[in-house]
């Protein structure tokens, strides 16, 4: 997003044109594309990526960990550590240096009050920032309208919860989805539909507490209805499934162990995909899992992938593998031989190729 809207109302058409060229080349090779408004941790200011700096400049956010019964309840799951406690050094643009960012924990950053509260301000359109985001999507939709290989638009990647340290209701599974995100998605949809009324919306639930990292990990209630009436808009329930979300200790060393990958992880993916499939059915849309994997070059990675795919076949769920490359940005800092599917010399990581080479079950079995 920040690479396209570099200043309020100012868009980088050259960058978008390069994206369009890539999409065209993929179409020539029979590859389907999802246009994803990708972000993690909202902004470079918070050691993440996604939103332009002017978004943060116009939004209010808290640096305080409120000590009350609500924070005590949430404290059962994690500790509140403000980002201001990190001893980051900043560059000439006032942004934390990547060397300092990667020294901390991606998970811990998500628990910070600054991050939770800035999401809350954004979702509520403080100072018209959400209006700016709608205009961003309208600009993008003009470029990709009618493209045959574009499956749909993922409106916002992994929306984080409102400030869990303050708002007790946000700890209730499904509350943020139904009372904040539905309205958020509907507002974006209204803008996109002015440009591309035939597009397909992909909408995501919040990762926590909709997925609870206790007792082996469980997917809980999310949306009770689609953000927009199904008779008006094509929509897909878009979820992610990572074993690290099953329990706080599963990925304490970075990734699941081989023992977890062949046992607990497979069970978690089965429970989660079963619940997600039922949720999608209840609200009358298909489900798609657009992120799983993102694991390193290891035997454990291979078996976790197989466990996930077995569950996806069982529940007839479409999926896409998520991979990182070593681009050295703030949230994709994987080593060259990890998390992607290529080795540094350009050859494929054969075990991942093997794990991902699966027949499309609905094609050869038809609908059950």
Short names for language-model regions:
Residues 2-15, 47-57, 113-126, 164-173, ...:
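Surface-exposed, active-site-proximal loop segments in enzymatic domains
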Residues 17, 21, 26, 120-121, ...:
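Membrane-proximal envelope and lipid/glycan-remodeling enzymes
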Residues 124-152, 156-315:
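Extracellular glycoside hydrolase catalytic/binding regions
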Residues 10, 40-120, 336-339:
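Aromatic- and acidic-residue-enriched segments that line the glycan-binding/catalytic groove
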Residues 1-60, 64, 134, 138-144, ...:
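Aromatic-lined substrate-binding rim segments of carbohydrate-active enzymes
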Residues 225-227, 238, 299-368:
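Aromatic-rich peripheral "rim/lid" segments of glycoside hydrolase catalytic domains that contact
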Residues 1-2, 37-45, 154-160, 205-207, ...:
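Short, solvent-exposed turn/loop segments enriched in Gly/Ser/Thr/Pro and often Arg
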């Amino acid at each position: 997003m920040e690479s396209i809207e570099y200043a309020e109302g100012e868009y980088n058409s050259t960058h978008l044109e390069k994206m369009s060229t890539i999409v065209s080349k993929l179409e020539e090779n029979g590859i389907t594309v999802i246009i994803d408004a990708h972000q993690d941790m909202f902004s470079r200011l918070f050691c993440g990526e996604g939103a332009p700096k002017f978004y943060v400049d116009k939004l209010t956010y808290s640096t305080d960990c409120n000590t009350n019964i609500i924070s005590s309840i949430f404290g059962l799951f994690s500790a509140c550590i403000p980002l201001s406690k990190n001893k980051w050094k900043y560059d000439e643009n006032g942004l934390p240096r990547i060397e300092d960012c990667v020294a901390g924990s991606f998970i811990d950053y998500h628990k910070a009050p600054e991050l939770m509260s800035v999401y809350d301000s954004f979702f509520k359109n403080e100072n018209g920032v959400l209006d700016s985001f709608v205009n961003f999507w309208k600009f993008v939709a003009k470029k990709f309208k009618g493209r045959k290989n574009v499956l749909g638009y993922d409106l916002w990647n992994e929306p984080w919860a409102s400030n869990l340290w303050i708002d007790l209701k946000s700890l209730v599974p499904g509350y943020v989805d139904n009372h904040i995100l539905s309205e958020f998605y509907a507002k974006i949809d209204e803008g996109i539909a002015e440009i591309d009324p035939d597009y397909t919306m992909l909408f995501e639930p919040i990762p926590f507490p909709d997925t609870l990292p206790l007792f082996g990990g469980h997917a809980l209630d999310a949306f009770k209805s689609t953000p927009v009436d199904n008779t008006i808009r094509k929509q897909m329930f878009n979820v992610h499934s990572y074993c690290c979300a099953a329990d706080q200790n599963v990925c304490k060393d970075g990734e699941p162990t081989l023992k977890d990958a062949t046992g607990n992880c497979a069970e978690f993916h089965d429970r989660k995909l079963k619940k997600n499939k039922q949720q999608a059915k209840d609200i009358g849309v298909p489900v798609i899992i657009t992120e799983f994997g993102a694991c390193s070059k290891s035997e454990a990675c291979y078996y976790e992938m197989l466990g996930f795919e077995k569950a996806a076949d069982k529940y007839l769920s479409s999926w896409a593998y998520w991979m990182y490359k070593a681009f050295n940005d703030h949230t994709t800092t994987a080593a060259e031989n990890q998390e992607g599917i290529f080795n540094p010399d350009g050859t494929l990581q054969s075990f991942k190729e093997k794990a991902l080479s699966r027949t499309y079950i609905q094609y050869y079995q038809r609908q059950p």
